[in-house]
Amino acid sequence: MLNEIKAKTKERMLKTIQSFHDDIKGVRTGRASASLLDGIVVNIYGGHQKLNQVAGVSVIDNKTLSIKVWDISVVGEVKNAILNANLNLNPVVEGSTIRIALPDLTQETREKLVKLLHQFAENARIAIRNIRRDIMEETEKMKENKEISEDDFHGAKKEIQNITDDNIKKIDGELSIKEKDILNH
């Protein structure tokens, strides 16, 4: 029973960590990265397609991305999707290829990005603490229903707190690395 509680806690918190990781992966660091365009959705063929489903994205150098659109008839829509993503990017079309020269980040932009990172991190921490609260309430009910003993309850409580602390440390560690990356490039 306790192993199930522990596994459930870890699984739910892992999903939160992965979501946080995906959020910060899309934040620019001053270096070209294909993941910068991961969240872009293109309106084509009467529906929505992720950019990586209609084009190949590659890094040419530290400041340049190349997007090879597989269907030349949708190059304009891909360009518009990039422009509408509010990433402060200026795509240039060259046939079926779109090149993006990444502008240097100003200090003001860097500070805004760091604020955004902190917001993502705080949202992830809140989600982790909410998961802890939910699991603790579940465990409390199990104790009240005599499904687990008092000792098991206290052991589970301690274990859940340790898992929570570990996951918050992971969030803070990833935040610190990404923050340094933004401020030092």
From Swiss-Prot:
SUPFAM superfamilies per record: Ribosome recycling factor, RRF
GO molecular function: ribosomal large subunit binding
One Pfam entry name: RRF
A Gene Ontology biological process term: cytoplasmic translational termination
Major site of localization recorded for this protein: cytoplasm
Domain of life: Bacteria
A Gene Ontology cellular-component term: cytosol
Protein family (similarity comment): Belongs to the RRF family.
PANTHER family: MITOCHONDRIAL RIBOSOME RECYCLING FACTOR PSEUDO 1 (PTHR20982:SF3), RIBOSOME RECYCLING FACTOR (PTHR20982)
Name of the protein: Ribosome-recycling factor
Organism (species): Wolbachia pipientis wMel
